[in-house]
Amino acid sequence: MTQDELKKAVGWAALQYVQPGTIVGVGTGSTAAHFIDALGTMKGQIEGAVSSSDASTEKLKGLGIHVFDLNEVDSLGIYVDGADEINGHMQMIKGGGAALTREKIIASVAEKFICIADASKQVDILGKFPLPVEVIPMARSAVARQLVKLGGRPEYRQNVVTDNGNVILDVYGMEILDPIALENAINAIPGVVTVGLFANRGADVALIGTPDGVKTIVK
């Protein structure tokens, strides 16, 4: 199976967690896009979705799924999204698609976070994938200096502006042995909107696409 076929398999597998009559939290990226395609088959059964990016919103609306503003919603049963890396503690690096802040906000509201990923995203230690940090533009250099002090090698992601109007620093060279401590430390830097470490709020369920089928891991 190709990597895209593995992503499609987990995207469709996540449908089993969608309850009729509910509002579904939806992530961003190539794997989440397969889940949106699958969700389109249930559009008459669900109330709608809350989306983590303009791109996902457009795709959902194109399938006839009503998209709610998060401010209209008290709670979400599930949030379904991919990951750039996921470790054995269900902690993740996310933000390769630059939607990390909205993803983290929606994940915090959801009762259950379902991570969908192909097996290549599983790691023992987070950090080989560069760690994205969303930063207010005027603070870019100041934040970069602080990230160097934390042992990272930040690089400005050229020609990318987030849906919130901010910029992304990708931090290379991090071996993240204590993800919660690092998430808290980076989030405390003035000018940081959020970091793409999902450690304080990790996944509750991981659906991992393998050549032998979809593997389910429950926290």
Curated annotation (Swiss-Prot):
GO terms for molecular function: ribose-5-phosphate isomerase activity. One of its GO terms (biological process) is D-ribose metabolic process. Its EC number is 5.3.1.6. The active site is at E103 (proton acceptor). The keyword Isomerase applies. InterPro entries: NagB/RpiA_transferase-like, Ribose5P_isomerase_typA_subgr, Ribose5P_isomerase_type_A. It holds the Pfam family Rib_5-P_isom_A. It catalyses: aldehydo-D-ribose 5-phosphate = D-ribulose 5-phosphate. Keywords: Isomerase. Pathway: Carbohydrate degradation; pentose phosphate pathway; D-ribose 5-phosphate from D-ribulose 5-phosphate (non-oxidative stage): step 1/1. Substrate binds at T28, G29, S30, T31, D81, G82, A83, D84, K94, G95, G96, G97, K121. The keyword Isomerase applies. Coiled coil: none annotated. One of its GO terms (cellular component) is cytosol. Catalyzes the reversible conversion of ribose-5-phosphate to ribulose 5-phosphate. NCBIfam families: PRK00702.1 (NF001924), rpiA (TIGR00021). Homodimer. Belongs to the ribose 5-phosphate isomerase family. PANTHER family: RIBOSE-5-PHOSPHATE ISOMERASE. This is Ribose-5-phosphate isomerase A. It comes from Salmonella typhimurium (strain LT2 / SGSC1412 / ATCC 700720). The lineage of its organism: Bacteria, Pseudomonadati, Pseudomonadota, Gammaproteobacteria, Enterobacterales. The gene is rpiA.
